[in-house]
Amino acid sequence: MMQRVTTSMTTAAAQRNLQLGASRLAEAQERAASLDKLSRPSDDPTATGEALRIRNLQAANAQYQRNVDDGSSWLDTVDSTLSSTHDLLAKVRDLTVQGGNGALGPDARDALARQVEGLRADLLQTANTRFAGRSVLAGTSDAPAAFAADGTWSGVPGAAVTRRIGPDTAVRVDADGSAALGTGSDSVFRLLDDLAADLRSGVPVTGRLTQVDARMASVRAVQGDVGARHAQILRSKETLIDTSTRLEGQRAELEDLDLAAAVLDLKLQETSYQSALAVTAKVLQPTLMDFLR
């Protein structure tokens, strides 16, 4: 049985098509303005979920990059501190060699002792170098200085400052001050006190060279470990940059709309809407019978 198509049915269909065209045009305009494929989760629930997962990975990767930058700054400071420490000890060694000259008189030996004491003060200041409000040779200790005036180390044995640079990777960014400079009676500061006292009292100091050399070697050993950790962090930085680029590409593939494609779609929707307007205008034109009713 053939169904009769009335004017009202035709009009309603035309209006629905017009509304649909207007809705599609509005969506195309929104996409062209924002260049977002996913204006709302309902656009593509699966893609939206994947985009959120990638954004979470990007946030974590960005945090690792910040940790790498902070850790690198820590290790730069530690390395510089240890280099300065080694240089000061090299000067102490030179003074020790000079002090081994048996022909030196009391005044000359006293002058050398005063230089050793000056280097000790410089060494203490260097050993207490801070970064971001923390002593770089005191581990996790919140003490204001890594070493007290008497050479006692204020750090906590085995407690290290670390930075997480990956899901399963954390790197130590400080250095063990006691391993480099000793502590208390075994510290380099006590060694320099004894050296200055020996110089003043006329006690031969050549035997102190072995102790100075040993302490210089311990500083270099700690510095070598710092260098290895710094190299690890720099390698990690390159990996994180690559990961950032890859994740951004994945995110853009899911979320970002190509400008040319967006403009083309907008033009198509505008043309379609204009056609729908023209058709609807004809459908809604009053007929002769409308005027005769």
Model feature map: region roles:
Residues 145-201:
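Cysteine-poor, low-complexity segments in flexible/peripheral regions
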Residues 1-142, 197-293:
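Amphipathic alpha-helical polymerization modules
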